[in-house]
Amino acid sequence: MEIQNTKSTQILYTDISTKQTQSSSETQKSQNYQQIAAHIPLNVGKNPVLTTTLNDDQLLKLSEQVQHDSEIIARLTDKKMKDLSEMSHTLTPENTLDISSLSSNAVSLIISVAVLLSALRTAETKLGSQLSLIAFDATKSAAENIVRQGLAALSSSITGAVTQVGITGIGAKKTHSGISDQKGALRKNLATAQSLEKELAGSKLGLNKQIDTNITSPQTNSSTKFLGKNKLAPDNISLSTEHKTSLSSPDISLQDKIDTQRRTYELNTLSAQQKQNIGRATMETSAVAGNISTSGGRYASALEEEEQLISQASSKQAEEASQVSKEASQATNQLIQKLLNIIDNINQSRSSTASQIAGNIRA
């Protein structure tokens, strides 16, 4: 009975000493890991990246510190293995082996960084999608500007053509009217004047013949009976004023008509020439009017072309930004994969250590 109590007391002391050793070793190990983690330069921000700004002396000190800490960890691990070997004889179902303390706190840090990078990757993916939509909208706007530019050019061309054709038609009509009036003056007034001139010439010829006949014919009337021996010679006979007026009155009337017709012809010719000049001037100004009406369409087309260039520039910038965002997302994804590989390696090391410990315990 005393021997059994002695064994129980020894086992109790052994458990207490083992727990104290385990607690002290865990505290020392945690401090060592904290020191190691303090030397890891890790910046977590919008784009978390690992940055190292140490010089050669600091790197040498850090390597020495890491080597020293590794030796401490190795000694603590050996001591822990010995303690576990001693505790293996006193284990009960209520006092099972707990190896959770063998996991480093760096795993939690790496997991947090991986989660942050995953959120960053999601944000970058959304940003890339939004930039792609912006690029698509800019391209669509550029296409619409091209369509509007074509419509403006088409409408301005149609407007200019219609204006030019309309003004040219008006001028041509005016010119045709002047030519028609000139032809009418030639057919009517000038022809009438020429006909009257011929009639006047015939009348003068007949009058001259009549005068010659009256002068050269013998005087048989009663007025010559009283002349007697003092009869006048034929060349001394003169016509009375009434006789001359009666003979020349048809010629005067014809000459007036001729003068009237010629004046009318000249006036009609001038009017026709004026219409022709107006028509030609109108047709010459049709090109200018067409260019003026087309200039508005060209201005609208230039504005649409400017909007098109702006839309194309916006689309190009959005595409470049989207490409940069995609590249950043891919880089973040690669970094996440590296962190996941590190976590996987840690888990495998932990499983291997646990298996080794279990094998040693069974041994």
Swiss-Prot record:
Encoding gene (name): sctB
Keyword Transferase: no
Keyword Transmembrane helix: yes
Subcellular location: Secreted; Host membrane
Name assigned to this protein: Type 3 secretion system translocon protein SctB
This protein's GO CC annotations: extracellular region; host cell membrane; membrane
Known role: Component of the type III secretion system (T3SS), also called injectisome, which is used to inject bacterial effector proteins into eukaryotic host cells. IpaB/SctE and IpaC/SctB are inserted into the host membrane where they form a pore and allow the translocation of effector proteins into the cytosol of target cells.
Span of the signal peptide: none
Taxonomic classification: Bacteria, Pseudomonadati, Pseudomonadota, Gammaproteobacteria, Enterobacterales
Topological type in the membrane: Single-pass membrane protein
Family: Belongs to the SctB/SipC family.
Annotated keywords: Host membrane, Membrane, Plasmid, Secreted, Transmembrane, Transmembrane helix, Virulence
Entry's transmembrane regions: 99-120
Subunit details: The core secretion machinery of the T3SS is composed of approximately 20 different proteins, including cytoplasmic components, a base, an export apparatus and a needle. This subunit is involved in the formation of a pore, called the translocon, in host membrane.
NCBIfam families linked: IpaC_SipC, T3SS_SctB_pilot
A UniProt-annotated Pfam family: IpaC_SipC
